[in-house]
A protein has these predicted regions:
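Membrane-interface alpha helices of multi-pass inner-membrane proteins
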Residues: 71-103, 117-121, 314-315
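Perimembrane helix-loop-helix junctions
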Residues: 93-120, 136-148
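Transmembrane-helix signature of polytopic, membrane-embedded enzymes
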Residues: 11-34, 255
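Transmembrane alpha-helix segments characteristic
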Residues: 26-28, 250-270
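Specific aromatic-rich, kink-prone transmembrane helix
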Residues: 50-67, 288, 292
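Short acidic/glycine- and proline-prone juxtamembrane loop motifs at membrane-interface regions
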Residues: 43-49
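Transmembrane-helix motifs of polytopic, lipid-linked glycan transferases
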Residues: 2-18, 239-243
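Lumenal/periplasmic acceptor-binding loop at the mouth of the active site in multi-pass
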Residues: 1, 161-242, 254-257
Length: 333
């Protein structure tokens, strides 16, 4: 269901908001769903797969507000914020940015404020109930089971020290391990290799070595591609993205997307949250790439436009079948 609605919303963004032809919209939609961890997010029951359609829906509705010169209705804000923030608070912040971009003044009216505050209070109540009704009793049962196991087997759990040491090394050095917020930071993992190999690498094109391994268990933080062609493709996508941002620099929709992108990059690359496995968060930001490329296509004409669309189609088809082959092979093995 998430995959179907993600395709529909992405396609409508390209046609309704950017005014692209159907063939061009299909090419960009294919490119989006050829990204490795977009494909995986649609296959795995996790919140990343649910985040994508809600973020795309937010973009679609925001774009329509921009075109009409209207604001989000309070009930729309309440629904969007409840479901986006319910998946992850960072998504809720992105929804708030969309509300702000649509109507910078009206967003501070009491109805608009309540449309965010009330869902937030409801989410807090649900979180508290979940913690005391399910999580805490489960932790107590697990602790009891571990204690019983240790009584029967004195050696039980002694090997965990090696696992903990490995994970501490993989997760990098935090600014302050005792601080509730700063413990999620990472100031030791190199940024440039993270961008090349993980953010713009594994997120889009799977590595053949250490295929789909977990960085918390056995995967190195950085894995290099076997051939230079993968870095060329990675660079081409980045170049098309930058060109698209330039062509869309006068669009309010582009600036909204850039605010989302800047927030994610500040959180992951700057603060270091999840930097060692940043590719698993691809569904939160990678859809901005084909939308930006769509701005470039919209402003081009003639041969240049045809060349860009052809390049996007070729990249999308190649990446789709390349990543799909590895995913299917992994599942079969």
């Amino acid at each position: 269901v998430s995959a179907v609605y993600s395709v529909i919303f992405a396609y409508r963004i390209f046609t309704d908001l950017l005014g692209l032809a159907r063939t061009e919209a299909r090419s960009l939609t294919l490119l989006l769903f050829s990204f490795a961890y977009i494909m995986l997010s649609m296959m795995v029951p996790d919140h990343f797969g649910l985040s994508l359609p809600w973020l795309l829906l937010t973009v679609l509705l925001a774009g329509r507000c921009f075109k009409r010169g209207t604001a989000f209705k309070p009930w729309q804000q309440a629904v969007l914020f409840f479901f986006t923030a319910g998946l992850t608070l960072t998504n809720g912040l992105k929804s708030c940015l969309a509300f702000l971009f649509a109507a910078p003044r009206r967003v501070w009216r009491w109805r608009s404020v309540l449309s965010v505050v009330l869902p937030l209070a409801l989410l807090f109540g649900i979180r508290q109930y979940q913690q005391f009704a399910y999580e805490q009793p489960m932790k107590e049962r697990v602790a009891m089971m571990i204690e019983i196991k240790k009584q029967k087997d004195p050696n039980f759990g002694k090997g965990d020290a090696k696992i903990v040491a490995w994970r501490e090394k993989q997760n990098g050095t935090a600014i302050d391990k005792d601080n509730l917020l700063l413990q999620w930071s990472d100031i030791s993992t190199p940024r440039l290799p993270s961008v090349i190999h993980n953010l713009m690498g594994e997120s889009l094109i799977l590595h053949s070595q250490h295929l789909l391994e977990d960085v918390q268990n056995n995967r190195p933080v950085f894995v290099a591609y076997d051939q230079m062609v993968f870095y060329v493709v990675e660079g081409l996508i980045a170049l098309l993205f930058i060109i698209g941002v330039w062509y869309g620099r006068r669009s309010r929709l582009m600036w909204l997307l850039l605010s989302w992108f800047a927030f994610d990059m500040l959180m992951h690359v700057g603060f270091g949250f999840g930097l060692n496995e940043v590719y698993i968060m691809t569904a939160h930001w990678a859809f901005i790439i084909p939308i930006a490329i769509g701005f470039a296509i919209r402003h081009l004409s003639g041969t240049k436009r045809e060349l860009v669309v052809s390049a996007v189609s070729a990249l999308g088809a190649w990446m789709f079948f390349y990543n799909l082959a590895f995913i299917v092979g992994y599942c079969v093995d």
